[in-house]
């Protein structure tokens, strides 16, 4: 497929996402809102977009106000829709839930509508990340050439739909991206970097090359069977824990956008019990279970690369 055809499909798919989101938000407003609870988080400024989040203050919104914020959030796809001071790199998050009363016919209609939106979002992400054939660093410029100001993460994010929950509880999750590597794999990566000299602020080209050479020497000095691990922290995320009484099971969802809960009165479902979301404080995290960590030694800080001792 030609690059021109891909761009045509990209734009066409995105227009469909916008149209279907507009139709969904209009549709939801026609149905009976049983309960709504969303939690706005402080906006991340451009100056603080790379800073670690040690505390997050939560503001709760209820009822129609919560619904208005949620429906607007689903359609928040461009930086032009937000403050100039707000970071375009930091994710815009609005955890919470909207609960609507439905019968069998309405439930099926909304399920199909949301499934279609999620299919379009997945297709759009596939075009950008796979079909474009571009490395991650080049995708941003390519997408924004055709869709200026697009917040790609918001365009990718699918909607979460649940049916007849008994309870909904919100919380915070701290995660790491973990990848195991061999010594030779790391050396291969560093070789590629050494073969393409460049400057990386605040270092000059020569300083950066020297830094890479030192890193290469440090890794080469390790035994070939050394166990290396990238353990990169991900910014804390809001989550929702859903309890289904009939199935006697709990399901956990990432919750960057409000969940849509359908309460089917044809099946005798009742209004769920919905909890709040506490402020986040990194110094007061309580772990239900924290396994004994493997002893690790940091060897290349910029890569979050550790070696197992």
Curated annotation (Swiss-Prot):
GO terms under biological process: DNA replication termination
Keywords (A to Z) from UniProt: Cytoplasm, DNA replication, DNA-binding
Transmembrane residue ranges: none
GO MF annotation terms: DNA binding
Cellular compartment(s): Cytoplasm
InterPro entries, per database record: DNA_replication_term_site-bd, Tus_dom1, Tus_sf
Listed Gene3D superfamilies: 3.30.54.10, Replication terminator Tus, domain 1 superfamily/Replication terminator Tus
Recorded GO CC terms: cytoplasm
Similarity field: Belongs to the Tus family.
Chain's role: Trans-acting protein required for termination of DNA replication. Binds to DNA replication terminator sequences (terA to terF) to prevent the passage of replication forks. The termination efficiency will be affected by the affinity of this protein for the terminator sequence.
HAMAP family assigned: Rep_term_Tus
Protein name as annotated: DNA replication terminus site-binding protein
Species, as recorded: Salmonella paratyphi C (strain RKS4594)
């Amino acid at each position: 497929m030609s690059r021109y055809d891909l761009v045509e499909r990209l734009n066409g798919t995105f227009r469909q996402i916008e149209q279907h989101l507009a139709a969904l938000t209009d549709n939801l407003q026609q149905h009976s809102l049983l309960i709504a609870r969303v939690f706005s988080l402080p906006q991340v400024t451009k100056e603080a977009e790379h800073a670690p989040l040690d505390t997050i203050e939560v503001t709760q919104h209820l009822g129609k106000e919560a619904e208005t914020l949620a429906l607007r959030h689903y359609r928040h796809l461009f930086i032009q829709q937000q403050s100039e001071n707000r970071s375009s790199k930091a994710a815009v998050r609005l955890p919470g839930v909207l609960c609507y009363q439905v019968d069998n016919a309405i439930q099926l209609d909304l399920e199909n509508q949301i499934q279609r939106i999620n299919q379009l979002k997945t297709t759009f992400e596939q075009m950008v990340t796979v079909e474009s054939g571009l490395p991650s660093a080049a995708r941003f410029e390519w997408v924004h050439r055709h869709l200026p100001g697009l917040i790609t993460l918001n365009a990718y994010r699918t909607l979460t739909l649940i049916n007849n929950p008994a309870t909904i509880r919100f919380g915070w999750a701290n995660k790491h991206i973990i990848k195991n590597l061999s010594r030779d794999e790391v050396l291969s990566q560093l070789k590629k970097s050494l073969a393409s000299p460049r400057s990386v602020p605040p270092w000059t080209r020569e300083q950066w090359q020297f830094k890479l050479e030192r890193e290469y020497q440090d890794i080469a000095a390790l035994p070939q069977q050394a166990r290396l691990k990238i353990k990169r922290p991900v910014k804390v995320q809001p989550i929702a824990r859903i309890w289904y009484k009939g199935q006697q099971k709990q399901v956990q969802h990432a919750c960057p956008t409000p969940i849509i809960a359908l309460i089917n009165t044809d099946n005798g479902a009742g209004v769920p019990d919905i909890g709040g979301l506490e402020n986040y404080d990194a110094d007061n995290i309580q772990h239900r279970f924290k396994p004994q960590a493997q002893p690790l030694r940091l060897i290349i800080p910029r890569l979050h690369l550790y070696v197992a001792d």
